[in-house]
Swiss-Prot record:
GO terms for biological process: glutaminyl-tRNAGln biosynthesis via transamidation; regulation of translational fidelity; translation. This is Aspartyl/glutamyl-tRNA(Asn/Gln) amidotransferase subunit C. GO terms for molecular function: asparaginyl-tRNA synthase (glutamine-hydrolyzing) activity; ATP binding; glutaminyl-tRNA synthase (glutamine-hydrolyzing) activity. It comes from Anaeromyxobacter dehalogenans (strain 2CP-1 / ATCC BAA-258). SUPFAM superfamilies: Glu-tRNAGln amidotransferase C subunit. It catalyses: L-glutamyl-tRNA(Gln) + L-glutamine + ATP + H2O = L-glutaminyl-tRNA(Gln) + L-glutamate + ADP + phosphate + H(+); L-aspartyl-tRNA(Asn) + L-glutamine + ATP + H2O = L-asparaginyl-tRNA(Asn) + L-glutamate + ADP + phosphate + 2 H(+). The gene is gatC. Residues 74-84 have a biased composition (Low complexity). Transmembrane segments: none annotated. Its EC number is 6.3.5.-.
Amino acid sequence: MALSLEEVRRIAVLARLRLSEEEERTFAGQLSAILDHVRQLEELDVTAVEPMTHALAAGELPARREDAVLPSLTPEEATAAAPAREGTAFKVPRIIE
């Protein structure tokens, strides 16, 4: 089932995205393909599969590494290209009243 351009526009509004007409067409195709894949997954018989709370069994968790401080951008470097900033913080439009 293909998503209509109107459905893509509604999703874009909800996600607060501005899409060009070309992007709307591209996303309509991509989202439709994703939904088709999910529909195929829904058809699989998983009655013999034991439910899991994690993708890996408890004994198979990957090894953890120690945290390490690595070189990073300064606050000034990180905000240098921001359209708006206040001191060393990004300034964004208020979306919640």
